[in-house]
C-alpha cells in the first residue's frame, strides 16, 4: 500500500507529456538533436508512411509520404519550450515541414517505469 501511495505522489507532482513529432523521412535526427540539447534522452524514432491520396497531399502542400515519427517524454513544464525550438529548427511555419503536439500522461504503471521516464534513477525503490 505504501508503494502505491508513493507512485500516486510522484505522478501528481511531476507531470509528463508525450511529445509526438512528425517530419519528412531523414529529418528525425534534427528533432532528436533538439531533445538531446535539452537533456531529454527518452526518445523513440519510428518510420511511417502516409496513406492520403496524392490530390489531398497537393492541397495541403505535402510532398513525400515517408515520415519519421519521434516519440519523446518531456516534463510538462518544458513542453512549450521544446515545441517552439523544434518548430524553429525545422521551420514548421512553412507548409509540409512537419507537426508536433503533446499528449499529457495521466498515469504510468510501475515506479521504475516512471523513474525511467523522468530520468530519476538515483533513488532506491
What kind of region is each of these model predictions?
Residues 1-125:
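Positively charged, small/polar-rich N-terminal and surface patches that mediate targeting and assembly
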